[in-house]
Amino acid sequence: MAAPNEFYETLKQRLAGVKHIVLVLSGKGGVGKSTVASQMAIGLIHRGLKVGLLDIDLTGPSIPTMFGVADQQVHTSSEGWVPLYKYDQRLAIMSIGFLLDSRDEAVIWRGPKKNAMIQQFLSEVCWDELDCLVVDTPPGTSDEHLSIVDALKLCKPDGAILVTTPQGVALSDVRREAEFCRKARLKVLGVVENMSGFACPHCKDCTNLFSKGGGEKLAQEIAAPFLGAIPIDPMLGQSLSRGEDFLASCQAAPSYEAVAALIDPLMAQLGLVQATADTSTPSH
């Protein structure tokens, strides 16, 4: 492994062409963090931007499935790992899932090995010029998060998006995540409430299954922007399971407007502008 100073300098050079870095965090698993990360990446692509999506959720990598590339593997070059590209080379994807023999293989590693893999992921991937790198992190707060934030310190990430659900337990967990961000000096760019009621696929009416408005109240507590609430929508889940571009193929879905509405506030936070007036679907 490279000496610490050498590692940081190598990483800084690797990410020199990346304009913005956004981490997506959640206080616990199962709240839809990867769903939000994937849709933010896709939404930015539809604005004509070039995006990287780095899946560092080592024990539950779901990004490959969401983009229909779970059966593919990445290749190495003399420069390092080459990410998979989709959508006219405008989306670069890297995930631990590409390195496993099968999608059902369990990753049972101790902390030091996980941290070493995170350093590899960050420093040995050949990213091209990117408008934004979206990092899908593991759930919770652990040594892995400390490793990610520490490794990126010279690259000055823009901040983090916190994903929660309306339930009290999830909100309590994400409060701890917000405290982690404060201690790590990582700006909270916004809060997203996922699974905010159940959206009927027929009439699109939303029924509250849990308490309502918890994510927005949390955002007020920590003085962070509330980016929106996404209802439980079978069409969204089915689209992701099929590896489809939800924003392009499911515009009649009950959750479509809520998902699409996340993009403008994120771009405003990052100071990004739409690269083209053409928001048509990029080819795969």
From Swiss-Prot:
Binding-site positions, ATP: G27, K28, G29, G30, V31, G32, K33, S34
Keyword terms of this UniProt record: 4Fe-4S, ATP-binding, Cytoplasm, Iron, Iron-sulfur, Metal-binding, Nucleotide-binding
GO MF annotation terms: 4 iron, 4 sulfur cluster binding; ATP binding; ATP-dependent FeS chaperone activity; iron-sulfur cluster binding; metal ion binding
Domain of life: Eukaryota
InterPro entries (UniProt xref): Mrp/NBP35_ATP-bd, NUBP2/Cfd1_eukaryotes, P-loop_NTPase, YlxH/NBP35
Pfam families per record: ParA
CDD domains assigned: Mrp_NBP35 (cd02037)
Protein known as: Cytosolic Fe-S cluster assembly factor NUBP2 homolog
Cofactor(s) required for function per UniProt: [4Fe-4S] cluster
Cofactor note: Binds 4 [4Fe-4S] clusters per heterotetramer. Contains two stable clusters in the N-termini of NUBP1 and two labile, bridging clusters between subunits of the NUBP1-NUBP2 heterotetramer.
Subcellular location: Cytoplasm
Gene Ontology biological-process annotations: iron-sulfur cluster assembly
Positions contributing to [4Fe-4S] cluster binding: C200, C203
Signal sequence, renumbered to the chain: none
Family: Belongs to the Mrp/NBP35 ATP-binding proteins family. NUBP2/CFD1 subfamily.
